[in-house]
């Protein structure tokens, strides 16, 4: 008699590899997009502010599952773009995380005392130099807890990609369950696998927070 707790592990390990790939690449792109959008939300240029705000509100106002289906099926139908599943998944995570990171960036920058900008001007720095050398380093330190939480949220959101048959952890577990007709063991081990990833991530985040005293 097979031990399904053990037998399912190779399937889930394959899923973890893809889960981590999508998460790291997607969140990295999302951070760049979020930083640009967050600064756009602080811009005095109405066009830049408007574009950034529309993007953030659309993403935050719609479920990520809808975003996944729209990117994978909707764009293919509308524009004739045949995205492969992994590319579509990375785009979805990047766009979703980017919107939330934009608000983290906006809040982090706004949390810095305005006197810091005045100090930059008194030193002869341009607004962009003040942002780069004075505001941004301080703001980034304050953003770390929220950015870490967003990474964990995005990691867990990858489970939704099973709806487009991306071979991440949940999909692999479901495939095993459907072929062996056992459900408790695979889904229990799926939960364990997510905890194996997220608990160390949370511990690392707390360690960084303590080191930086944020």
What kind of region is each of these model predictions?
Residues 1-214:
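Transmembrane alpha-helices and adjacent helix-loop boundaries
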């Amino acid at each position: 008699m097979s031990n399904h707790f053990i037998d399912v592990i190779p399937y889930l390990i394959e899923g973890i590899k893809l889960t981590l790939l999508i998460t790291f690449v997607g969140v990295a792109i999302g951070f760049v997009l979020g930083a640009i959008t967050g600064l756009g939300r602080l811009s005095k240029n109405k066009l830049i502010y408007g574009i950034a705000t529309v993007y953030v509100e659309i993403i935050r106002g719609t479920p990520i599952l809808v975003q996944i289906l729209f990117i994978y099926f909707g764009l293919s139908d509308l524009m004739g773009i045949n995205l492969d599943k992994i590319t579509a998944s990375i785009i979805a995570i990047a766009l979703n995380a980017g919107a939330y990171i934009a608000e983290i960036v906006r809040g982090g920058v706004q949390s810095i005392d305005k006197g810091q900008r005045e100090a930059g001007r008194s030193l002869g720095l341009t607004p962009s130099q003040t942002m780069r050398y004075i505001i941004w380093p301080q703001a980034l330190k304050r953003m770390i807890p929220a950015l870490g939480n967003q990474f964990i949220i995005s990691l867990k959101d990858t489970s939704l990609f099973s709806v487009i048959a991306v071979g991440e952890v949940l999909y692999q577990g479901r495939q095993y369950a459907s072929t062996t007709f056992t459900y408790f063991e695979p889904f229990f081990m799926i939960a364990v696998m997510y905890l194996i990833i997220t608990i160390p991530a949370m511990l690392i985040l707390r360690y960084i927070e303590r080191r930086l005293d944020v």
